Amino acid sequence: VVHTFTMESADSKIYPGIARTPGTRATVDPADPAKRIVSSGPAPYSRRVAVYVPQQYVPGTVAPFIVGADGPDQLLFTALDNLIAQKRVPVMIAISIANGSGDAQGSQRGLEYDTMSGLYAQFVETEVLPLVEKQYNVRLTKDPDARATMGCSSGGSAALAMAWYRNDLYHRVLTYSGTYVNQQWPYNPESPGGAWEFHRSLIPKSPVKPIRLWMHVSDRDNFSESDGMHDWVLANQLM
């Protein structure tokens, strides 16, 4: 069974909503090619959340779950139907969350997915999951080994950021064509290269974290810019 509900920006304490100024694009900062100049301001949004509850689930029991970006994702639910029936994965809940609209620097989606912090994980933990449990009589595990995140493109880098910065919450990550490149905005001096820092500095210089990461990228998924941090294939290879 797939349930859906809508979340409004006015109800969020974490993401009140932004959008890039219409008709504008991010431009390279001539003083630092790793930075972007962006015109952006407050803007409301609505987002849909789809919750997959398999027929094998016993209401009220604790279950593992996966959180997906850029939802709703019907293909994920179909895949889980088959995998659960084949007993290749346990009976699990899936929460597929739409982004807050827009794309890249200055957008709500970019703010959520490309920011190098645990803020999106906090949003999911405090604003999304309690609604899921309350509305659909499900209990979501607190065990990080039984919690997974997944996403494609910037949703992929967000999935890893959720586990990296909130390792107390997530240990399992799936990414497709993860944007492990320099997409972050606003600029953060603690991670000047955005998600490029995962392979340039964070992973090499940090103690080992209990994260299991599955990655996929196609060899033609390639886009480069002069700052050297916008090559999707290279970024995933470096990971």
Where do the protein language model's features map onto the residues?
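Non-catalytic cap/lid and distal C-terminal segments of serine-dependent acyl enzymes
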Residues: 1-239
